[in-house]
Regions:
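Active-site-adjacent loop and "lid" segments of alpha/beta metabolic enzymes
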Residues: 1-2, 10, 17, 23-38, ...
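Active-site loop-to-helix "anion-binding N-cap" substructures in soluble metabolic enzymes
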Residues: 7
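CE4/NodB-like, metal-dependent polysaccharide N-deacetylase domain
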Residues: 71-92
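Short acidic, glycine-rich surface-loop motifs adjacent to enzyme active sites
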Residues: 91-101
Length: 166
């Protein structure tokens, strides 16, 4: 069983890796270089999440582009290059669709953005790392059929050639 830890805090990452975690789900960029070095030292993988801010607790809005992939690609290119310089050999890119942003409170806007990103995730594979996507719940859209949300989004993610669903 592979244990993963979701964090942007370096001390939490150290504790989790020391306890046996083999995957860090990095939800911030402020300490990414140190995180990559730490993961490499522990022979762990890192899921690099796209975050429009220093970490997922300090964001307000995300750009709502007609095509979000170029913006995400630019971010991931920088992070992958830095990770490689730090000795990290295993990683995933994650468009970060599960994070809260002020301008995605309207469920129709958020779901449209998520669907567009899922369907175009295959374009991130050119960066050389597999793509990971978290599956939304979309409670306000699916209501009592909320259990249908993850299968719905997993189909879109599969069409977009997502490598890892969580």
């Amino acid at each position: 069983i592979v244990i993963s830890a979701e964090t942007y805090d370096l001390e939490v990452a150290k504790a989790c890796l020391a306890a046996g975690a083999k995957v860090l789900n990095l939800t911030g960029t402020a300490k990414s270089e140190a995180m990559y070095r730490l993961a490499a030292e522990h022979d762990a993988a890192v899921i690099v999440c796209y975050v429009a801010g220093e970490n997922v607790r300090e964001v307000s809005e995300i750009p709502i582009d007609h095509d979000p992939i170029p913006r995400m690609s630019e971010f991931f290119e920088r992070e992958i290059e830095l990770a490689a310089k730090c000795g990290l050999i295993r990683g995933f890119v994650d468009p970060g669709l599960g994070f809260y942003y002020d301008n995605l409170e309207d469920s129709s806007v958020r779901i449209k953005h998520q669907m567009k990103t899922f369907l175009n995730a295959f374009r991130l594979r050119k960066l050389g790392w597999p793509v990971c996507n978290a599956l939304p719940h979309a409670f306000e859209c699916f209501g009592e059929e909320v259990r249908s949300a993850e299968p719905f989004f997993s189909v879109l993610a599969a069409l977009g050639k997502t490598d890892l669903l969580r």
